[in-house]
């Protein structure tokens, strides 16, 4: 069991239903942990389809679970498999629990969702709680509008999960910046578990191959990017509409689409 090992293990569940932010944050945390402790290994659970494109340091690895994507109407569907979302979630939940059972972490860090996507982590939380494994919920410093978050967490029964499972709640930021749970009525016992971690310094690689960039008119241009790009088609559509209306007075635009932009969305944009 974990208490009899010389090398410690951390398991991170990465909320991955959309975009790059969750994966990048979990990766940064994992790298910081192994840099701090040479006896530590970190395993990340993620459904991101591009997790294999990232570089991971020694003693950091990942398990890729079947991916899902959130539609505009709020519903989730399987990212690649042509199967029902409930089947996909059942597969994900089983893989997550089995990985936790075998990896037997010294600590579990859950990203954003106290019970995971649609409760898929609950059985894993029950397993590790029975073993006495410390469990942490990690939250970014700015979450959502307080009213919207309160409604969402009430629907997901998230607050009882904080009391039942988590030893600490890590807020990745400073209390002077934001309290992400300001709109949630939390028991005092849960409030006392909140720990503000501060921020990790982002290191830019010393040498990165520069992408090929088209020559810009007069050296000035407008850079338009939507992060991962999964929900960026409306932004790009508005930008292109502005250029169609009065493009002569605007600088040249460079659009960076991101890896999650759907091919169909790309082909429907009104390029001229």
Predicted segments with their positions:
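A short, glycine/small-residue-rich beta-strand->loop->alpha-helix junction that serves as a flexible
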Residues: 14-27, 51, 232-234
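Conserved nucleotide-sugar phosphate-binding/catalytic loop shared by glycosyltransferases and other
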Residues: 7, 14, 32-87, 91-93
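An aromatic- and histidine-rich active-site surface loop
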Residues: 50-52, 108-127
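Donor-nucleotide binding loops and adjacent catalytic segments primarily
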Residues: 30, 184-186, 199-272
């Amino acid at each position: 069991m974990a208490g009899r090992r010389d090398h410690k293990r951390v398991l991170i569940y990465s909320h991955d239903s959309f975009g790059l932010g969750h994966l990048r944050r979990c990766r940064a945390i994992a790298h910081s942990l192994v840099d701090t402790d040479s006896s530590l290994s970190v395993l990340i659970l993620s459904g991101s389809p591009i997790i294999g494109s990232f570089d991971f340091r020694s003693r950091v690895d990942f398990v890729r679970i079947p991916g899902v994507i959130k539609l505009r109407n709020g519903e989730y569907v399987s990212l690649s498999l042509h199967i029902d979302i409930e089947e996909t979630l059942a597969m994900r939940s089983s893989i997550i629990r089995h990985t936790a059972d075998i990896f037997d972490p010294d600590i579990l860090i859950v990203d954003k969702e106290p019970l995971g996507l649609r409760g898929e982590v609950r059985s894993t939380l029950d397993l590790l709680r029975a073993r006495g494994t410390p469990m942490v919920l990690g939250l970014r410093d700015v979450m959502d509008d307080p009213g919207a978050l309160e409604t969402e967490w009430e629907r997901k029964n998230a607050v009882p999960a904080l009391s039942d499972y988590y030893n600490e709640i890590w807020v990745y930021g400073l209390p002077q910046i934001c309290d992400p749970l300001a709109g949630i009525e939390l028991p005092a016992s849960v409030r006392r578990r909140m720990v503000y971690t501060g921020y990790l310094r982002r290191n830019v690689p010393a040498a990165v191959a520069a992408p090929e960039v088209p020559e810009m008119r007069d050296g000035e241009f407008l850079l338009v990017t939507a992060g991962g790009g999964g929900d960026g088609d409306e932004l790009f559509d508005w930008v292109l509409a502005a250029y169609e209306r009065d493009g002569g007075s605007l600088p040249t635009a460079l659009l960076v689409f991101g890896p999650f932009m759907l091919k169909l969305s790309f082909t429907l944009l009104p390029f001229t």
